[in-house]
UniProtKB/Swiss-Prot annotation:
GO terms for cellular component: cytosolic ribosome; cytosolic small ribosomal subunit; extracellular region; plant-type vacuole; plasmodesma. This is Small ribosomal subunit protein uS19u. The gene is RPS15A. GO terms for molecular function: mRNA binding; structural constituent of ribosome. PANTHER family: RIBOSOMAL PROTEIN S19P FAMILY MEMBER, SMALL RIBOSOMAL SUBUNIT PROTEIN US19U-RELATED. It comes from Arabidopsis thaliana. It is found in: Cytoplasm.
Amino acid sequence: MADVEPEVAAAGVPKKRTFKKFAFKGVDLDALLDMSTDDLVKLFSSRIRRRFSRGLTRKPMALIKKLRKAKREAPQGEKPEPVRTHLRNMIIVPEMIGSIIGVYNGKTFNQVEIKPEMIGHYLAEFSISYKPVKHGRPGVGATHSSRFIPLK
């Protein structure tokens, strides 16, 4: 077995790369795109099922309309123009895959390219709204023992 591999490598035959085909809860991407909203909602978690059962308002539908327009106007093989939005609570659905969305984080619009792995998540999960804490040295008065630490 070990002596077979060097012969294959020496022959100059490139090893084919196999890519994992995406599936959401056992359903492949093509089937997700063809699925009706009712069937799609059954695959989502309970929190998102509840959100869909309470109905979609005008705002998320307007965003999807803008995304469709951006995809339609994009040249073949090019990425669509980014669509800016404040709708951080928008749930990512299969129709949005391939779009670029500028998600507002309270200060700027973070551009997020929608990938198949993001289905069923909120847009806010991909645009962090706070700056993570970088802990430095403790200041004076942080602990009782800090009274004995000389000031610089």
